[in-house]
Amino acid sequence: MPDIKLKNQASLCASTRLFLAYTSIKPFDVAFHPKEPVVFSSLLTGQVCAWSYDDATGETSSSWSVRPSKRTARALSIEENGDEIWMGGKSGSLLCALTPPKVIQLSTRDGSMTRERDSAHECPINRVYCVNRNLVATGDDDGVIKLWDPRQADSIRTYSQHFDYISDFTYFDDKRQLVATSGDGHLSVIDIRSNKSTPLTVSEDQEDELLSIVPIKGGQKAIVGSGLGILSVWNRQMGWADSVDRIPGHPASIDAIVALTPDIIATGSEDGMIRVIQVLPHKFLGVVATHEEFPVERIRLDRNNKWLGSVSHDECLKLTDVEDLFEDSDEDDEMEEDEPDSDEEKSKKKKKDNGMKDMSRGQAENDGSFFADL
């Protein structure tokens, strides 16, 4: 496929609008409502906060805040119908709260708790993932994974193939496979249809912490972020034993990934930057947002693929407009038709098109050699 270019520096800065919902306390996770313009965040204090936002402008207003736990609320996940939000945290408890049909309307039910499972895990829960309406996955600091049916009081299966924290989950519906990444350097695949408490497969040791995962290429492949700043590409048709490609270049750990298109991902890194990268062929496209020197904890894309939500240690939830991030194909066609004839004009055009599209000139200089070896 042809390279997908970001808009030029001036246009990018003008069109990438940032709106901050300050939490005053360190946030750990971010989640978007699947049907409404509402964004949620879990906080160090055990709170879960909700903000409504304008679909067009991104302007936010606080909707509600609850504190279901006195200990850190680490992880959030929302059911596909948008009715309930699940929270896991340092206490090891698993909580479920209502997200009313119109969260922007304050009522006594805003954030009200519907279910609580004390001591769901023996140690802190690090990740929660709603697979579907009747299945929720949780992973803790010891590498234990549990599957839950909301209609039942206890977990339905427990997996212990990992020996370090569970960092992320993703799900492939065609094969009913839940994939988990871990700080022990392995990823594992669980067939949710199986009644056995053993995984379908466990990968080879990648000799690095695996921190994040997201499907790409229409679910044919997956890409995983690591502690050393390397992206690994996994081909499902070739199995999950080992990755098929590696993309070096990030100067710090890749703690979060989202897919913007089937071929384009955004990564949140320990150095505070959110980068956009094209995969197969590999190309670094630019930096679209930054949390300065604070590490990016999580990033999510909203239901319209317009707003990219990110949280960091800078005590704010940031919304970045990524809807018009890439040049329109019509613009590319016009540029090809108006291709300059002289070598001098071609040279000028090449310099203009290949410039790094970072949020500042300094960032562009720092990242100029990024992915230079690809």
From Swiss-Prot:
GO terms for cellular component: nucleolus. Residues 325-344 have a biased composition (Acidic residues). It comes from the Eukaryota. Keywords: Nucleus, Repeat, WD repeat. Residues 325-374 are annotated as: Disordered. It is found in: Nucleus, Nucleolus. WD repeats lie at residues 21-61, 68-107, 120-158, 161-200, 205-244, 249-287, 290-330. It holds the Pfam family WDR55. Belongs to the WD repeat WDR55 family. PANTHER family: WD REPEAT-CONTAINING PROTEIN 55 (PTHR44019:SF20). This is WD repeat-containing protein JIP5. It comes from Cryptococcus neoformans var. neoformans serotype D (strain B-3501A) (Filobasidiella neoformans).
